[in-house]
């Protein structure tokens, strides 16, 4: 299913490096070894209340570029969008309930003509662990997303300092140099950008730390259990 592939590609792009957040020392981060930077980042993420994760995953051409913009609120849920060349969907998770609203083309891919007709202009509602919703919801659950960010990196090496959007950052590379995470060197050690140079190249930006995230159950939702195939 194309929708399921969206999720797999986005999550795969996040694997090579670690996500950091608030709570770090404002001085000396750039002088630490890469393992210490990652360890401090791992501890810090436990305290961030909210974060925005946005970016692109490139499957080889701009036609196949996947764009996503997610806002995660720890302990409450999340909201966001994912799009690829005419197929797009919005997501909201609130507690144990997930909502998805797709474009007509997306619903055609997801469930066929009958399902697309029933969901025109509506949200589909389901338990967050139900079927494909478990894949959708994984993108908007902070804990799950962070787990993907933290797993599977190889030996780490420290890069140079630079500036991104006016903030000084230190680079941390994975063993294959396929992934580079840029972490702020002053103030809390927030992640600023993750770049993955693998075949599914990605650029992922982090921001909005501890910013308010407005979550509301969408109106005009249809239960997944009431759909007629």
Residue ranges, per PLM feature:
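N-terminal leader/targeting segments and the immediate start of mature chains
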Residues: 2-5, 9-74, 162, 211-213, ...
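N-terminal mature ectodomain segment of secretory-pathway/periplasmic proteins
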Residues: 38-106, 180, 196
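Short solvent-exposed loop/turn micro-motifs enriched in small/polar/acidic residues
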Residues: 63, 82-85, 153-155, 165-167, ...
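Short, basic/low-complexity N-terminal boundary segments at the transition from targeting/disordered tails
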Residues: 68-78, 134-158, 164
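A short, polar/proline- and glycine-enriched secondary-structure boundary/capping micro-motif
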Residues: 89-93, 110-113, 202-205, 226-229
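Acidic/charged, solvent-exposed loop-and-adjacent secondary-structure segments enriched in E/D, K/R, S/T
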Residues: 101-145
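A short, charged
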Residues: 114-133, 209-229
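Gly/Pro-enriched, hydrophobic low-complexity segments
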Residues: 160-222
